[in-house]
Regions:
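Bacterial Sec-exported substrate-binding components of ABC uptake systems
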Residues: 2-49, 145-176, 283-290
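Short helix-initiation/N-cap motifs at beta->coil->alpha
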Residues: 26-28, 80-89, 209-218
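Proline-aspartate-enriched helix->loop->beta-strand connector
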Residues: 38, 85-104, 119, 217-231
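A short, structured surface patch at a secondary-structure boundary
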Residues: 40-94, 98-103, 205
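Short secondary-structure boundary segments
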Residues: 45, 103-104, 179, 209, ...
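His/Asp/Glu-enriched short active-site or ligand-binding loop at hydrolase and phosphoryl-transfer sites
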Residues: 65, 190-213, 233, 261
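Flexible loop/hinge segments that line or gate small-molecule binding clefts
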Residues: 67-73, 106-138
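Structured C-terminal subdomain patch of bacterial secreted/periplasmic proteins
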Residues: 86, 131-141, 150, 170, ...
Length: 290
């Protein structure tokens, strides 16, 4: 099986007089994370909770962060609140044998304290689709679900390749993705959302921004003439989104009523549901071509 960034060597240790294989992978900070048999896993980021579920490891999870809300079964687990507010002591009190965290969503000082206490910590920061798949593979290795989840991960990645093959060669459609309205925020070219737009044959009008997210101006959006306006949210959010931009009827996207929302979380949360979001984005961009 193709494994990304997994260490080729298997470390052998001794437990109760028997040899036990310890799986080692590198996390997204290039730190080596080794575990023998994960049984008490703390997951402190929503995208990681969804990935653990996708690879079949939820039976080993003892608690999650407060924002994890998918799958529905996660709501039966203890929720620890905002990881930024958690100290190492409160995490250690749960007696985890593996902690999964988002680099942008936790203090790295806390991570260092956990590692000093002997707890393996996997730090995640996927920015591209392939990196999400890599995270799936590495976590499945740590959780002991590698064999039964391998084909599912391959199929997930293949669906993106199929979308690119179907839409990638079509006429390019300029797209503005809105993260927030006040202040007006968007995502740059380093985020997976930009990659999704591109594989659908679109172009993020702020692909040139070096940061993952940035504040922009209405004038800047108008100048780049998007043909699709895109955001994440509910039906109620969609109506607000449409009304927000109705004051600029000269914008191609507004003039042609190409203003869309995708359901909350699935596009900006770099996890398994990203493929469902990508299919919606491709359909919206295709509609703008007609």
């Amino acid at each position: 099986m193709k494994c990304i960034r997994l260490l080729a060597a298997v470390c052998l240790t001794w437990l109760s007089g028997q040899a036990v294989a310890a799986v080692c992978v590198q996390d997204d900070t290039n730190q080596t994370v080794c575990i023998q048999q994960a049984q008490r896993v703390l997951v402190l980021a929503p995208h990681l909770t969804e990935i653990v579920d996708f690879v079949g490891g939820m039976s080993k999870v003892i608690a999650v962060d407060g924002s994890s809300n998918f799958p529905e079964s996660v709501n039966t687990l203890p929720k620890l609140g905002n990881p930024w507010m958690l100290g190492a002591e409160s995490i250690l009190a749960r007696k985890p044998d593996l902690v999964l965290v988002w680099q942008s969503g936790i203090s790295m000082e806390v991570v260092a304290q956990l590692r000093k206490a002997g707890v393996p910590v996997f730090v995640s920061e996927p920015k591209k689709i392939e990196q999400v798949a890599s995270t799936m593979r590495r976590l499945s290795a740590l959780l002991g679900t590698e064999q039964r989840s391998a084909s599912r991960i391959d199929d997930w990645l293949q669906q993106f390749k199929s979308l690119r093959a179907e839409y990638g060669g079509r006429s390019i459609v300029p797209v503005f993705y809105q993260v927030w309205s006040q202040p007006l925020m968007t995502l740059g070219g380093q985020h997976a959302v930009s990659e999704v737009i591109e594989l659908c044959g679109g172009r993020n009008i702020f692909v040139d921004l070096p940061n993952l997210a940035a504040q922009v101006s209405v004038e800047g959006v108008l100048k780049r003439k998007p043909e699709v306006l895109l955001a994440s949210g509910s039906e109620r959010d969609h109506q607000s989104f449409v009304m927000q931009w109705a004051s600029w009827p000269q914008m191609p996207a507004v003039k042609r009523n190409q203003v869309y929302t995708v359901p909350n979380d699935i596009l900006v949360r770099n996890g398994p549901r990203l493929i469902g979001a990508a299919k919606l984005v491709c359909a919206h961009i295709e509609q703008a071509r007609r």
